Each structure stands twice: as structure tokens, then as C-alpha cells.
Amino acid sequence: MKGLFVTIEGPEGSGKTTLIQGLLPYFEQKEQKVMATREPGGIAISEEIRTILHKQEYTMMEARTEALLYAAARRQHLVEKVMPALNKDYLVLCDRFIDSSLAYQGYARGLGMDKVFEINRFATEDCMPSLTIYLDIEPEVGLARIAKDAGREVNRLDMEDISFHKRVREGYLQVVERFSDRIVLVNADQPMEKLIEEVIQVIEDKLL
């Protein structure tokens, strides 16, 4: 693996997708080979799994099923899209990766971070990001953003009650503490222009 693998993490409404779209032009104009992708998804098989995971009517989905589906989507996306790009010296910007599973299924769903981490170690063959940016935001603020975004389709996880979203944030903060060597916490409750500038600085300071 020769490229740089940067993952962007955060609760619902933290601005991950918008941030990545703001980062792309900066690195492109610097003639850095850069690729944006997302989880679950990014390639056909994983997008199909994403559809299943996000369907509002699948409220009966059991936590282990959910965790295994995310890991399956992650595996296919990694081998089909991420690894080939890294081997061609790309900077890969990925919207979510293993830390999402630790926060959502490991902590918020109560499966245990260690168990979920082992599932994902198997799925990824211990491939970890070069750097992770965690966008921290209060759940109420993030969910309010989602409610105002008419273009965003509400998915099954968005529909969880506020206590679930609070547990997700608590889980993320534990993940940040556990993997402090590669995760940088950034306050997401600020104008997007300032957030983009701050994250560019972090990426350049840490990796470039």
C-alpha cells in the first residue's frame, strides 16, 4: 500500500459528505491524485448492501445482522476500490470506515467494541487508515441539520430516537480515545468553509 487512506467519521448530520466534496478541489489543484468514496457503498455490491441497511421498513434488523452486513460491504469496497487506488498512490478520502461500526454497532447497539473490531479485522485484513478525522457534533445539532436538508433521504438509522444518537457520539468519543494515534477530533459545529480549512491543515500536517 503506497497511497494515503484518510477516513472521515462522525454522527448523523456532522457534515462528512459536504466536507469531502470541499476537500477534493483543493487536492486536485495541487495535482495530488485523489479519490472520494463512501461506506457502505462505493461499488455496486456494497451499494446494494447499503440499500438493505438503510431501508426504513427494515426496523426488525438484528444488531449482529447489521454489523455483519456493514463488514461485508466494507470488505468488497476495500478490495475492489480502495486498495487498487492506494496501490496507485492515490489519496483516498472515505466517508466512514471501521470506526463507524465500533461506535454504532459496538457501542450504541451494545454488541461490544472488541467483538465488532474483531469482525472488521477479519473483513479488512487489518487494513487501517493512515489518518481519521472525527467530526464531533451534539446529536441535537446534527439531527436538526438533517431535518432542514430537503434533498437528504431519511434512512433507518436517522429514525432512531435521540438516546441512540447520544450513544453513538459517546461511542465515537471512546473510539477517539482508544485510537488517538490516528484519529484527530475536529469541532463540526462551525461554518463549512472554516471546517474545510481546518481539515486540510490537519491532513497536510499529518501526512503530506
Curated annotation (Swiss-Prot):
Sorted UniProt keywords: ATP-binding, Kinase, Nucleotide biosynthesis, Nucleotide-binding, Transferase
Record GO terms (molecular function): ATP binding; dTMP kinase activity
InterPro entries linked to this entry: P-loop_NTPase, Thymidylate_kin-like_dom, Thymidylate_kin_CS, Thymidylate_kinase
Keyword Transferase listed: yes
GO CC list: cytosol
Pfam families: Thymidylate_kin
A Gene Ontology BP annotation from the UniProt entry: dTTP biosynthetic process
Entry EC number(s): 2.7.4.9
Enzymatic class: transferase
Catalytic activity: dTMP + ATP = dTDP + ADP
Residues involved in ATP binding: 10-17
Functional note: Phosphorylation of dTMP to form dTDP in both de novo and salvage pathways of dTTP synthesis.
Entries under NCBIfam families matching the protein: DTMP_kinase
UniProt similarity note: Belongs to the thymidylate kinase family.
The name this protein goes by in its record: Thymidylate kinase
Organism: Bacillus cereus (strain Q1)
Lineage: Bacteria, Bacillati, Bacillota, Bacilli, Bacillales
Gene this chain is encoded by: tmk
